[in-house]
Amino acid sequence: MAQPRTRPQLNADFLAIMVRGVSVIVSASDPDLVPSVMRAVGSQVSAEGEHVTVYLNQSQSKQLLRNVATTDRLAVVFSEPSTHRTVQLKARGVRVREASEADVPALQAYLASMTVELGKIGIGPTLVAAMLAHRLDDVVALEFSPEEAFDQTPGPRAGQPIARAA
């Protein structure tokens, strides 16, 4: 009998940076484990971290999206540039959909958060806007529920799994 899926229990610090909106890097490997990596142009995380949506420019993410379609695996890293606090999530069962007008508030909130966050390390709003530029008709949303989580903050705990909830 298959084990029921559990979800990682994310601590309050990791949840806070994820919900607020920090740098998000999305990756997926092909069947030969060759990775494809893209910067997200937005994210939305539920308060408890059980539902995550990351937004990508579809035209720039074709290989990554093919990899997700082929392997149904995804890894996403949330990293706070000013502190380097970083959490990596892994998941299967990824739902890919076109972004819609309903996603615009999440994309705008992400841009605002990243403008503040990157401003802390001297990156101005013009560069942030260019880095996260998108056309809504080119944006896809990848929705998932995390199955694994790892502390990737540089230091002695880097790479350690975050304990799972029962």
Predicted features along the sequence, with ranges:
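Short beta-strand segments
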Residues: 21-57, 88
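Short, surface-exposed loop/turn motifs at beta-strand boundaries within globular domains
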Residues: 19-21, 69, 137
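Charged, gly/pro-rich active-site loop segments
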Residues: 85-166
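Short secondary-structure capping/turn segments at boundaries of alpha-helices and beta-strands
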Residues: 12-14, 24-27, 39-41, 63, ...
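Short, basic/aromatic recognition patches
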Residues: 2-23
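A generic local secondary-structure boundary/capping motif
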Residues: 14-15, 65, 129-134
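A short mixed-secondary-structure module that forms the rim of ligand-binding clefts
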Residues: 42-83
